[in-house]
Swiss-Prot record:
GO molecular function: rRNA binding; structural constituent of ribosome; tRNA binding
Biological source species: Brucella canis (strain ATCC 23365 / NCTC 10854 / RM-666)
Pfam families: Ribosomal_L1
Entry-linked HAMAP family: Ribosomal_uL1_B
UniProt gene name: rplA
Recorded coiled-coil stretches: none
GO cellular component terms, semicolon-separated: cytosolic large ribosomal subunit
GO BP: any one term: regulation of translation
Name of the featured protein: Large ribosomal subunit protein uL1
Biological role stated in the UniProt entry: Binds directly to 23S rRNA. The L1 stalk is quite mobile in the ribosome, and is involved in E site tRNA release.
Length: 233
C-alpha cells in the first residue's frame, strides 16, 4: 500500500490540479509522469454543455487522427460474397455473416471495431444488446455501415476514433501513446477537439466545451486551457 501511495504522489508531484495548462505544457507533464512499465495510452476527456438524455443533444462522430492511435485495432466485418472478399483483402481480422452472428451472439467478442454492409443490418441489428453497450454497433453516421468496406477497414486500422458523449456529458478517447513525440500528440488532440466541435448539436445552448483534460493510462489528469486546443464556441 505504501508503494502505491508513493507512486501516486510521484505522479501528482508538480501538477497543479487547479491550473489550466496550455496544451504543449500539459502534454509534457503527462509524458513526464507516465511511469508504468508499458507504453501508456494518452487519453483526452472533454466535458460538454449538453444533456445526452435528449436525442437532439447527442454528440457522436468519428475522426481520423493524423498520427494514428498507436494501438492495433482488430476489425470485424459482417458481409457476404464480393464484399466479404474485399474486407479480407483490406485486412479485416474477422469476416462473416450468419456464422459470425452466432459467435458474437454467444458473447465472444474478439475485435475492437465492427463494420457491416447495409444488407447485413437486419441480422446485425439483433446484436444490439451485445454490441450496443460496448459502443460497437455499426452506424452509418460514423461510417461503419457502408458498401465501401475496404475504405472502412483501412480507416479503422489507420487511426479512426469514434466518439460518443456519455450520460454525464463527457467524451473520452485515446488519442495516442506516451511514446509519440509531443508534436504528434498535439496534432492528434487538436484533430479530435476540432471533430467534437464540428459535431456540436444545434440544440446545445450556452458554453459547449466546459473543461478539457488529458492523462496517461495510469497517470493523473492535467487540466488544459480549452483555447489552446482550438476550442472556440
Amino acid at each position: 500500500m505504501a508503494k502505491i501511495s508513493k507512486r501516486i504522489n510521484k505522479i501528482r508531484e508538480g501538477v497543479d490540479r487547479n491550473k489550466l495548462y496550455d496544451l504543449s505544457a500539459a502534454i509534457g507533464l503527462v509524458k513526464e509522469r507516465a511511469v508504468a512499465k508499458f507504453d501508456e495510452t494518452v487519453e483526452i476527456a472533454m466535458n460538454l454543455g449538453v444533456d445526452p438524455r435528449h436525442a437532439d443533444q447527442m454528440v457522436r462522430g468519428v475522426v481520423n487522427l493524423p498520427n494514428g492511435t498507436g494501438r492495433t485495432v482488430r476489425v470485424a466485418v459482417f458481409a457476404r460474397g464480393d464484399k466479404a472478399e474485399e474486407a479480407k483483402k483490406a485486412g479485416a481480422d474477422i469476416v462473416g455473416a450468419e456464422e459470425l452472428f452466432e459467435i458474437v451472439n454467444g458473447g465472444k467478442i474478439e475485435f475492437d471495431r465492427c463494420i457491416a454492409t447495409p444488407d447485413m443490418m437486419p441480422l446485425v441489428g439483433r446484436l444490439g444488446k451485445v454490441l450496443g453497450p460496448r459502443g460497437m454497433m455499426p452506424n452509418p453516421k460514423v461510417g461503419t455501415v457502408t458498401t465501401d468496406v475496404a475504405a472502412a477497414v483501412a480507416a479503422s486500422k489507420g487511426g479512426a476514433v469514434e466518439f460518443r458523449v456519455e450520460k454525464a456529458g463527457i467524451i473520452h478517447a485515446g488519442i495516442g501513446k506516451v511514446s509519440f513525440d509531443n508534436a504528434k500528440l498535439e496534432e492528434n488532440i487538436k484533430a479530435f477537439a476540432d471533430a467534437v466541435i464540428k459535431a456540436k448539436p444545434s440544440a446545445a445552448k450556452g458554453e459547449y466545451v466546459k473543461r478539457v483534460s488529458i492523462s496517461s493510462t495510469m497517470g493523473v489528469g492535467v487540466k488544459v486551457d480549452p483555447s489552446t486546443v482550438k476550442v472556440v464556441d
